Amino acid sequence: MAAVILVFGVLHASPAQAAPTPVYPISGYFIYGSTSDANNLKKLTDIKSVGGDTVITFGSLLKPATLSTIPAGCTISGANCAKAAAAGVSVNRYFTYSDNSSWGSPALLCGRDKTLTNGTTRYTILLLPSEGSGCSSPSNTYDVVVITGGQSSISISLGKIATELGMKYYAGLPAPVKRTDITYLPDLSYQATFSLFTARFLLYQDKVNDVPGLAGFYHHTEMPLSNGAVWDAVLKVYEIQNSRIAQYQPTRSALVSPYIDSRSAFSGKVTVDQAREAVRNIADTADGVDLAIAVQDGMGTGKGAAFFGSESGNSVDQYAAAIVGSGTWGGKYLAPSRDYFAAMAEGVEGTGVELWANLEGMAPATSQNPCDNSLRGQTTKSRMDKQLQQLGNTPRKVISFMWDPYFTCSGTYAPMLERLKTTSNTPVITDSIFYGNGDVLVTGHNLSGGTIQVKWTDAYGRVFDKTVTATSYNATYGKQVGINPLLESVTAKLGSTSLGSGKNYFINVTNGSGVKNDALYSDRG
């Protein structure tokens, strides 16, 4: 696998370069936004201080409703606002929506749309034609959406602050509710209304949030990386919304984050081959939109595993054991996340879609790692380093679920934010090539200015352990070969030797700051 990803190994001879200031190589985070500019400025500034340049928020549900469930405060001349706004037309269905945005006058597009304020609450009523297009229904039948908002908006504030800080923000898209019979699938019984409402959402964002910091939109509806036909309903949601983005926000991109579940004993487990096909299916929904697929690595939920082949017989750690029970990595999981990401890189090849990684920044909860009141717990820096190296060189960008609370909570450990500030210079080895001339190209992060230790077995069965000075440091390796631009490279010159076929070799890097990688790295000849 390494040889496929590192085909540009000749770049190991690039002139030595100065190392960039260390920052942790996670460059984006899911967050909970605020309507307060000050709160958002503090949060995004903290994220930027540890290398983040991107933030993502979740979407909200477009919920079917009845007249009796319309907010009581939404009245027109004392009458239910949905009923009053629909006077003189037939109503197909009612819906409610709330995403902590103000909506109001900028969202009004058609003559029957209305907005009103009751105290600090702003209501916006949209009448969406059940038939036809535009503002009018040939049958005079409409769907009524009542939006509840306030005097300020999370999305507008985050767009503003992201722009000021030179960062990128992905706003969460509306999502359908789940079905009542199959509760993990979206309810597509109102997909036409959902499509129209997505269009109105995008038009509203274009009017109030047309700033450089708004990079695009996040698909709130989630699915596993399964190629089963049952998940076609989720793909349909992606198709609907990507087509609307292409239509109304063509200069902005989209982001989706499916998840790996490689637990051997789980009935819904997904093989590497299925993941390759599934990510291709998601890519095929892009409809011309610049789409990134940020796959969750599963380490925070116990659904995925970070281990090398040389570790397959080792016991799972205490956090994974809380989910899958005692056993070995190779026994409890079908394959390591490294194999999944390599396959998914093949799956998106030629589609124009980017493969990202969503590194889960928490761990399964035990009594030893509480994190506020979350159902997940704090993780360790070394565990995250292991997750990072397992991603290899395939993801174009690494983001993380999620900033709050997992990077900010105190518990057994200090907040991860503080730990990242003090340990961001730890080497992380993501991949390598062992060349026939005895040179070993090592890629990763924080690799400059030190030594490389390589343990290997040659073609004659002789075992070697050699430490050499790291040479040919290339701070822009990732940029030069068109992969993750944060990736660096160094070379270990071992002299004339060979690598035994099928034999594991091991690499450690101690950088110029005297810091050694804290996660085992191995590969096979």
Spell out what each predicted region is.
Residues S36, I47-L67, A215, A286-S424:
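Substrate-binding cleft of secreted/luminal carbohydrate-active enzymes
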Residues M1-A18:
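Secretory targeting and sorting signals
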Residues P258-F266, F307, M416-G436:
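Short, compositionally biased P/S/T/A/G/V-rich stretches that sit at domain boundaries
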Residues T423-G449, Y521-G525:
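Beta-strand/beta-sandwich contexts
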Residues A199-R200, V230-R263, R276-E277, G288-V289, ...:
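Active-site neighborhood of glycoside hydrolase catalytic domains
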Residues T443-S513:
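Immunoglobulin-like IPT/TIG beta-sandwich domains and homologous Ig-like subdomains
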Residues T35-N40, V50-A229, I260-K269, D297-F308, ...:
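Aromatic-lined carbohydrate-binding surfaces of glycoside hydrolases
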Residues S34-I47, S195-K207, V270-I282, R376-Q390:
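Short, acidic/polar
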